[in-house]
């Protein structure tokens, strides 16, 4: 197989990487616990849980929002398929909203126009370091008693 790209790994991480690999705690343990604490400090929120992937995190968020077969989730087509696949995996229907032609982000007015009795959640994607209009979307969601799920993989550390 020809690799599409080679991951760069500086020699300075070798010792620490080997220490983690040989600890037996690859998916959980001291380093993950410390990372979650540091991340919580960074965000000012102690309730941090790391997941193996962004897709896994979105699957969990959809479960917590009680999204199931026959429900609708408003999302954007301007994203990686990994954002929308968990919606289908939950048995729900993806309802795409329009995107703002300047930012490429979900248009809050379009989101509101797509809401039906079956709408259970809004899946926002903060993209390219630009956060969506959270304030407006949260206002819409509250008005219609709909959960908001945010995919921030492309805007980590951005502020609104």
Q: Model-flagged regions — what are they?
A:
Residues 9, 27, 79, 102-103, ...:
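Glycine-/small-residue-rich active-site loops that bind phosphorylated ligands and cofactors
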Residues 78-84:
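Conserved coil-to-alpha-helix start sites within the AMP-binding
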Residues 18, 22, 36-40, 59, ...:
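Solvent-exposed, non-membrane alpha-helical residues enriched in polar/charged side chains
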Residues 102-160:
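Active-site phosphate-binding strand-loop segment of PLP-dependent enzymes
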Residues 17, 39, 57, 73, ...:
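Generic structural signal for small/hydrophobic residues in well-ordered secondary structure
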Residues 25-72, 86-89, 96-98:
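Phosphate-binding glycine-rich loop
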Residues 6-7, 98, 127:
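Conserved donor-binding loops in enzymes that form glycosidic bonds
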Residues 1-25, 30:
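N-terminal "arm"/small-domain region of PLP-dependent enzymes with the aminotransferase-like
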């Amino acid at each position: 197989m020809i690799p599409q790209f080679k991951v760069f790994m500086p020699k300075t991480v070798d010792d620490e990487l080997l220490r983690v690999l040989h600890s037996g705690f690859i998916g959980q343990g001291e380093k993950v616990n410390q990372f979650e604490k540091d991340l919580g400090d960074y965000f000012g929120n102690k309730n941090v849980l790391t997941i193996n992937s962004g897709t896994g995190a979105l699957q969990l968020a959809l479960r917590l929002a009680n999204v199931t077969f026959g429900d609708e989730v408003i999302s954007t087509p301007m994203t990686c398929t990994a954002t929308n696949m968990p919606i289908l995996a939950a048995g729900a229907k993806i309802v795409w909203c329009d995107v703002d032609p300047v930012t490429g982000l979900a248009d809050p007015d379009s989101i509101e126009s797509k809401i039906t009795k079956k709408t259970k959640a809004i899946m926002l994607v903060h993209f390219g370091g630009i956060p969506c209009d959270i304030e407006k979307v949260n206002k819409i969601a509250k008005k219609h008693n709909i959960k908001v799920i945010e995919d921030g993989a492309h805007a980590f550390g951005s502020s609104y």
